[in-house]
Amino acid sequence: MPEFENFNVKTTIDCKQGAVRAVRYNVDGTYCLSCGSDKKIKLWNPASGLLLKTYGGHADEVTDAAGSCDSSYIVSASLDKSIIYWDVSTGAPVRRLRSHAGGVRCVCFNEDSSIAISGGRDNAVMCWDIRTRRLDPVQVMKEARDCITTVATNENRIYAASLDGCVRTYDIRVGELTCDKIGEPITYLAQTRDEQCLVAGCQDSVVRLLDCETGGLLSEYRGHRGDDYHIECGILSNDAQIVTGSSDGDAFVYDLLDGKVLQRIRISDNGGVVHSLATHPKRQEMLFARRRDMYVFSTDLQIEEEQL
Amino acid sequence: MDEEEHLHRFGTPLPALQKDVVPAKKPVAIEDQIVKDENGKRRFHGAFTGGFSAGFWNTVGSLEGWTPQTFKSSRGERASSKAQLKPEDFMDQEDLGEFGIAPQGIRTRDEFANEDEQKQRSDQRRRKLMQPELGVGAIPGLPVLEQLLRPVRDKVAVRILKSMGWKPGQGVGPRQTRKEKRQATARNSKEQYLMEHYGAEGLPSNKENKGEEDSNNEDEDDEDITFAPDDYEPIFYTPKENRFGMSYSGLNRDPILSKSSSSSAKPMQHINLFGEMEAQANKKQLSIRGQAFGVGAFEEEDEDIYARDDMTRYDFSLADKKPKQKKQQHVQQRHVIDGFSEDNSPAVLQRPYAIDLPRDFQPRNWLQRRSRFAPMDKERAQKLETASEYKRSGLGRHDLNPDQRAQILGEQQQEEKTAEEQPKRNPFKDHSKSLMERINARTEGFTKGGVITENGEEQQTELAKEVKEANAAIQERAALKTKDLPSAMNSSSAFKPFIADEAKQLRYEKFVSSKLTDDKEITEFLARMQPVTLSLWDREMEKKEFIQAAKIYRPLVGLMNDRFVSEANVQAEKVEQQEKPPEERKIVMERTKTMWKPTALLCKRYNIAEPFGGAMLEPEKELKAKAKISVFDYLETSVNTKANFETPSIFPKHIEKSIPEKVETPPSPPPAPQPEAEIQDKPNTKEEPSKHTFVPKTPLEQAVDESRNKPISEKVDLFKSIFEDSDEEETELSEQDKLAILQESFGLPVTSTTSAAAQNVLRNTSPPRGIFASLFSPKIKDAAKEPAPTKFGPIEGSKLKIAYKPRKERLRNDRELAMAEVAPEDIYGPKLPTAPPQKPAAPEIQAEANIDDRLQQLWQQHAPKKRKAEKWVEKKCISGSEDSDASSSNESSSSDSSDDNDKRSKLSKPKKSHKGSSSKKSKKSKLKSKKKSKKSEESKHKAKKKKKKSKH
């Protein structure tokens, strides 16, 4: 097992779009998206901190965004209850999907980006057909009893984490809904790369590792502070470390196996909640969102030196 | 030459005409004269002289021509609200000018304007409101509420007067005592009298003091009761400017009906009936409102032809001054506000009056009125606060020590001894009480009214105000005294809350410096200092006050300490909180698995085969059925559904359970063979009857139940029983009943099992009429051929399954039955009619039938032979082979619409024409058909009524 290398700040970007609500990598991690409270999405080059494009058209804060597998489209969720499907290059909204009865909290694409899945404050998970011009959802799952905080998917499953403390797994292949009840409101959910486990960030300042197959609780990670914030967590590309934000302006890197804090990344001395983060799909790199800024952290020292 | 000298020449002579030259200068014709504005633009346009220049030379374009407006996207500036464009923005400069449509000038504000002006303006406003685009409310037109309610708004002058204590009906002036007032009234009445008899320049009134004497002895003690002076019309003594005789005014130079005659202070001359109208007319003239038609710019205004002759119309001198004057006047009037006129009287040097304002006078703009709900301004809030504090504590009187009281009462500085000996009493209260009593005793209808103070608020009583004022005065004095005192008695206490009362303040300072906290100690400490005169209650109050004051008026350091917390403390607290281990909650993972059906498209997009080959049971079928997802779907999200309040097993079916469930799904075999699809469609309807078994079923319901599972073809009977025209059976039934009743009354045994034939005998033998004729006759004829399958044919007695009786009838029958049981001797009161007399009814029907028959006979007699072939007219006669099918089907529906009948008649028309019938015939046939349709309509109504009844 390779030794853990500390993360260092690579780039700091002032997004200039109000509070940054979410930061996301695109499919291969070359670009990143930031969702602002000023109703705009911005596309960045995380390495250089270059602003590539701004996508404006939402009527309320943008809460989440995801890039398609070919990086030519973006889907974004907003509190204006709509989901917008953007053309990356033109920056124009291709489609606006409205069916949610409440603000949309999260959105994701399936593997071939033919389906967008969204979850909202109306407790509903909706699957949208992107290929056709259908404007109503393909399927609506209304099993959750509280706000959906995260939706995730893989080849044959859709995961939905909700504030009612349940992770719901919709297995399309089997035609089965598995509800794993943790009991604590789940603020974020991430999948491991091997798709065996789920990382669930809970409201009680604990990140929990769940086994997909059995539904068992594998591990708990404590140390950070969640308070009442919507703190996101993630798993690094090597599936060996778990990252989570914290309300005290830090980010924590835990060892997946023994649950120890490997690094407490001091993002800013000025406080501010590190609520959103994204892990690079391939490299040991992370994005953090704190207040109005986006931070890129990496273990790669060389780049840092170059930057310096 | 001599003559020339004697001639007097006036003016400059015209140049002598040259012989050859014709005068070239023609006067410019009126039509060629053009009025131009200051820009050289033509002012009036159009066919008539009065017109407006609108836009660019009366076009929509500009000098460059007209360009259509280009589309401008408002997308970028969606949020920014567009500035509301006013009509003025579209007006030309000249429209805003003096002669334009919307002249702008100085006007008096509404608050100051006189009444009719206000009214005029409000009218204008209303007119504006009436315009549809401006009427914003839901109800178009004049807002009703505004019509009903009119804000009460006094003039400013009245308001000022009111604030000074004036009330409507009162006069203005200093308050008078009773005596004074009486004198004043006497004087006024006298003046009034003189005024009436001698006019304004009447004799000066002599002072008569007769009345005073008797009043003097009445009461002298009520000097302190004052009254408002009476209101009276003041007499203005106008200085005499002319040398006419007394009260002679000479010929009035103004036109008789003009306004000035009425407004001038000459009372006895002329009553102007048209004053107001004239005034309005004048106003109209003054303000040119831009009427398009009227007097042209070059024309002289017409003389007032209706004005009566008066002296103004005569010239008193040769010089023609009038036009000049007029012009001048006009020019002057331009600068005068509407409704005003310039004062022509020579300016009199007026001595400027120096007003010495009260010391505490604060200028305030009365027009800046605040909303009632707006927060009070600080000053006033404070004022109120202090005032109410005073009242709340109820200590007004206790605040005064004997010295102060003495001051208030105007007593001379007395020795302390005597002051202390005096019993404690509130001088104000007693005094006021007696005063009030006295006033009440004296005057009738004296009501306690509020006085509007400077702030516009009504003080409860004058007394309170007085007390307050007095207090303020005392406090002021005290403050003055304390100012001189050596400052810094106690340097630590910068605040002196009890500065009004020196002794108290001293005590307070001592109390503060002692820094006592214990309640008992404080009482003891204070007791040592407090004067003996202070009552126990006062002492207690003082203690409380001190403690409170000490709390409030703390040194700044303490105040700050309270508000702010050092960061270190906060951090420590936070750490503490953090350190506290959060209660360990044992997380027990629960896993539940339920069936879930992904939609086909979702599977397709995920490139996965549908589970179970898509044969899964769909739990959300109804959701899919809805074309669109509406917001209301979410009203019953999973949280609200009933299922959620139950055990989770109910919530989508478990896989383990679902298999046996499936086996169970086919319910107990239905009463009748049924396709499977129907089972799923009507699971609820099947369950319902089992639930409501205890409800007794009506035969109709039974029939419905029975026939539920039958194919439609077999349900004919049911439909019949529901929809059929129950006329026939009812009549039958009623007759049957009547018969039974008759039999009963005659003591005969009731024959319930009468054969159809027997019943037929009893039936009304008269031939069927009207629509029934058309219904029955073919049936009877064809009865042998086609027996039953008619849907709505009349039901024969034996066939009758469901008999409907109107409730009334049933009741009656019951009653009659009950009556029949009781012996007639036991019943009193008028006997109820057992049954409607049948006999008188029969001849009537018979007669009708006869008439019909006779008509028919007549019809057949008079009709030409050919017409006999036209059997389509009367349904009764239809037995034709071609029409039989159609007719039978038509007749089978008893409640056939009149439209159908008409159609039929129309359809049959060509046939008739084919046979070469005249137009006359067709007319007749039409009439007939109309008649028929009418009848059928009637029957339809009847049927409807019946249906309604049956539903009940």
Curated annotation (Swiss-Prot), chain B:
Biased composition (Basic and acidic residues): 107-123, 375-402, 414-432, 679-691
Gene Ontology CC entries for this record: catalytic step 2 spliceosome; nucleus; precatalytic spliceosome
Stored PROSITE patterns: G_PATCH (PS50174)
Compositional bias of kind Low complexity: 886-896
InterPro entries documented for this protein: DUF1604, G_patch_dom
Biased composition annotated in UniProt, kind: Acidic residues: 214-233
GO MF terms held by the record: RNA binding
Composition-biased stretches (Basic residues): 323-333, 906-934, 941-952
Domain spans labelled G-patch: 153-199
Signal peptide span: none
Ranges where the record places region Disordered: 104-127, 165-233, 320-345, 370-432, 660-711, 822-952
Record GO biological process: mRNA splicing, via spliceosome
UniProt similarity note: Belongs to the GPATCH1 family.
Protein name: G patch domain-containing protein 1 homolog
Lineage: Eukaryota, Metazoa, Ecdysozoa, Arthropoda, Hexapoda
